[in-house]
């Protein structure tokens, strides 16, 4: 795993802890706005962050079911 992936996952976990699962939707909305206003690299970074948050949330849901 690259340093950028690790940093993205860490930030996603912090955002989930502070803002709950709704942060995934907000990140996707922000990515759409960034893309629409001509900032494709920012949009891609926000999508990566949203994906990392969603993956972490889904892993947590799976762990709860197994407990």
Regions found by a protein language model. Name each.
Residues 32-44:
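Charged, low-complexity interaction regions
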Residues 42, 64-67:
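Short glycine-rich, low-complexity/disordered patches
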């Amino acid at each position: 795993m690259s340093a950028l992936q690790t940093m993205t996952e860490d930030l996603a976990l912090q955002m989930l802890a502070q803002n709950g699962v709704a942060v995934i939707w907000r990140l996707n909305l922000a990515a759409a706005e960034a893309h629409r206003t001509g900032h494709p690299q920012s949009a891609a970074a926000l999508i990566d962050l949203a994906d990392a948050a969603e993956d972490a949330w889904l892993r947590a849901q799976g762990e709860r079911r197994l407990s």
